[in-house]
């Protein structure tokens, strides 16, 4: 099983598999504790931000500005002066009560993303026994329990309980 995020590309390259993926810089911020507002994980259709309020009361939000691609700094993920304000503007559209919330810290990191934005999950026919799970672009934590269950079924039983054909690696092969 190769489930190594962006590093899957390098690992798979050692057996001649070229996975069309890139890494995407994403940033996050955390606020001081605030009064309880909600328990759900939130995200917007406009992709302004995503996040949740912790039991402690602080908010953890993430997002992007669209300018992260120019801020790669030789491979070191660093926070820009652009992204946190963009995330905050998105938050303010929905939660104006957070206008005075203080940001405690910000950080940046890499997410793995497939060329078509859809993760790869399943067997790789070119290498018998190889199972791939990569390209989740930050969604891996949210869907990890379901992915783990389906991977276990695939490895043990040779099949999954749901149809994962749309996630197969060979969708990137030329169709002649």
List each language-model region with its residue ranges:
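Catalytic-loop motifs flanking and including active-site residues across diverse enzymes
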Residues: 4, 83, 87, 143-147, ...
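C-terminal lid/capping helical subdomain adjacent to the catalytic/cofactor pocket in oxidative enzymes
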Residues: 125-176
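Central helical "cap/lid" subdomain
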Residues: 2-38
């Amino acid at each position: 099983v190769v489930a190594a995020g962006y590093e899957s590309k390098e690992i798979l390259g050692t057996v001649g598999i070229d996975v069309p993926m890139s890494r995407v810089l994403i940033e996050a911020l955390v606020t001081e504790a605030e009064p309880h507002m909600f328990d759900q994980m939130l995200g917007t259709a406009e992709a302004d931000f995503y996040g949740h309020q912790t039991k402690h009361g602080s908010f953890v939000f993430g997002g992007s500005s669209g300018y992260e691609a120019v801020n790669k700094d030789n491979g070191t993920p660093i926070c820009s002066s652009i992204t946190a304000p963009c995330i905050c503007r998105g938050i303010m559209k929905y939660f104006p009560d957070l206008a005075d919330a203080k940001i405690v810290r910000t950080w940046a990191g890499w997410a793995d993303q497939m060329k078509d934005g859809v993760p790869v999950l399943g067997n790789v026919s070119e290498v018998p026994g190889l199972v791939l799970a990569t390209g989740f672009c930050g969604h891996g934590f949210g869907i990890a329990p379901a992915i783990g269950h389906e991977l276990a079924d695939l490895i043990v039983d040779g099949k999954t309980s749901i149809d994962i054909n749309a996630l197969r690696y060979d969708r990137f092969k030329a169709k002649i």
